UniProtKB/Swiss-Prot annotation:
Function of the protein: Catalyzes the NADPH-dependent reduction of glutamyl-tRNA(Glu) to glutamate 1-semialdehyde (GSA).
Binding site for substrate: T49, C50, N51, R52, S109, E114, D115, Q116, Q120
InterPro entries, per database record: 4pyrrol_synth_GluRdtase (IPR000343), 4pyrrol_synth_GluRdtase_dimer (IPR015896), 4pyrrol_synth_GluRdtase_N (IPR015895), GluRdtase_dimer_dom_sf (IPR036453), GluRdtase_N_sf (IPR036343), NAD(P)-bd_dom_sf (IPR036291), Shikm_DH/Glu-tRNA_Rdtase (IPR006151)
UniProt KW Oxidoreductase keyword: yes
Domain notes: Possesses an unusual extended V-shaped dimeric structure with each monomer consisting of three distinct domains arranged along a curved 'spinal' alpha-helix. The N-terminal catalytic domain specifically recognizes the glutamate moiety of the substrate. The second domain is the NADPH-binding domain, and the third C-terminal domain is responsible for dimerization.
Superkingdom per UniProt: Bacteria
Residues holding NADP(+): G189, F190, G191, K192, M193, S194
Catalytic activity: (S)-4-amino-5-oxopentanoate + tRNA(Glu) + NADP(+) = L-glutamyl-tRNA(Glu) + NADPH + H(+)
Official protein name in the record: Glutamyl-tRNA reductase
Organism expressing this protein natively: Alkaliphilus metalliredigens (strain QYMF)
Signal peptide positions (record): none
Length: 424
């Protein structure tokens, strides 16, 4: 079995392509069904964010898996045959393991060191568990990668000066409007990215903040705490455009929610407006930027601000990589021993059965012996047997880590006179 990862990220793929291959919730359900049906895929976890669309998997044959996943993406998302050329990535074995650790720490993010990706990885793993698509190999990998990421983030403070996509959007807005004090802002959506944006906006001295969401109940607590916050129903989003200085949109809609044709009918040019779209798929029709008076930004336009404080965070990366390599060595040791564990359990079961049988024979011959004395003998014999097996079992584990566990197991069988198939 081999661990692989296939997909696309912000490093090679444009936002147009990332938008096409984003796994919505409904698409995830369908995708997991297909992944579970495939004879080539034994375990799978889908990681889909605004900057990446990837599948981590356990496969038997990496060459077949690479071709299979390329075809899967092309067919599932109805892409042209050449759509993924030059912009997909594929890692296998240690490289795939290392890649996930880097993703969790934020080394592979648009914003180096950002924290949001760690939560997204945890959610992706939880979803895979819900769909019964993952197993012991990826479960162990994701849990270890998340744990290591938390530790190294604390040790190195790589996230200390990092920004999230949402906070970068607010900073872009602040730069474009030359300050946010006294401004009026509309935030569309109330998911995690929207809430982070709202937290940042409330620190900027804005005059009024409108939150547009399908239900008022979810934002009621914020409204009660902050008098400058007002609720808008989803149907009112266009009506407010002429009364705000800026818009941040971050919904989970699978289609545009702001269209050029509709905005042209409503938007009045008496005041310029900044619109920032941090959703994927995008919320705002890219053609909106053609409307006079409107400045439109999407995720890929935020890279310059994302690189602020980058030098400090890059200094942390070498320390992080060392910690990650140590964690990977530990995981790979566990992974290499997977074929050995059944043999170890079989050896233990064999020795326990043999010990119990011999003790039973002994106690039948010594039926006059007091129960207390029997217990003493049983404890001593079982302890002795356990000690005798300790070194062979440790050697078997070490052999597994070195990659020659099966050969060593066969030697142990022959040397100790066990059945050749006791570990199968």
């Amino acid at each position: 079995m081999k661990i692989i990862v296939f997909g696309i990220t912000h490093k090679k793929a444009t936002i147009d392509l990332r938008e096409k291959v984003a796994f919505s919730q409904s698409k995830k359900q369908e995708a997991y069904s297909l992944l579970k049906e495939s004879p080539f895929i034994h375990e799978a976890v889908i990681l889909s964010t605004c900057n990446r669309s990837e599948v981590f998997a356990v496969v038997q044959d990496t060459s077949i898996a690479r071709r299979w996943f390329k075809r899967f993406y092309t067919d599932f998302f109805q892409l042209k045959e050449t759509a993924l050329e030059g912009c997909n990535h594929f890692e296998k074995g240690r490289e795939a393991v290392q890649y996930l650790y880097h993703v969790c720490v934020g080394v592979d993010s648009l914003v180096i060191g950002e924290d949001q990706i760690l939560g997204q990885v945890k959610e992706a793993h939880a979803e895979a568990l819900d769909f019964a698509a993952t197993g012991k190999i990826l479960n162990k990998l994701f849990l270890e990668a998340v744990t290591t990421a938390k530790e190294v983030k604390t040790e190195t403070a790589i996230s200390e000066n990092a920004l999230s996509i949402s906070s970068i959007a607010v900073k872009q807005m602040e730069n474009h409007l030359k300050g946010l004090v006294g401004k009026t802002v509309l935030v569309v959506g109330f998911g995690k990215m929207s809430r982070i944006a709202i937290e940042n906006l409330l620190c900027k001295g804005i005059k009024r903040l409108y939150i547009c969401n399908r239900t008022k109940e979810s934002v009621q607590e914020l409204i009660e705490k902050h008098p400058q916050i007002h609720y808008l129903s989803y149907d009112q989003k266009y009506e407010m455009l002429n009364g705000v200085d800026a818009v941040i949109s971050a919904t989970g809609a699978p289609h545009f929610i702001f269209y050029k044709e509709d905005m042209e009918k409503i938007y009045q040019k008496h005041r310029p407006m900044c619109m920032i779209d941090i959703a994927l798929p995008r919320d705002i029709d890219p053609a909106v930027k053609e409307i006079e008076g409107i400045e439109l930004f999407h995720i890929d336009d935020l890279k310059e601000i994302a690189n602020e404080n980058l030098a400090y965070r890059m200094d942390c990366i070498e320390i992080i990589k060392q910690s990650i390599n140590e964690a990977i060595e530990k995981y790979e040791g566990w992974y290499q021993c997977l074929p050995i564990y059944p043999r170890i359990q079989a050896i233990k079961a064999y020795s326990e059965t043999l010990t119990d049988q011999e003790l039973e024979k002994l106690f039948k011959r010594l039926d006059h012996m007091a129960e207390e004395d029997r217990q003493v003998i049983e404890v001593v014999v079982k302890s002795l047997v356990k000690k005798m097996w300790k070194t062979p079992i440790l050697q078997l584990k070490d052999a597994g880590i070195r990659g020659n566990g099966e050969a060593f197991a066969a030697f142990v069988d022959e040397f100790l006179g066990l059945d050749a198939g006791c570990g199968k």
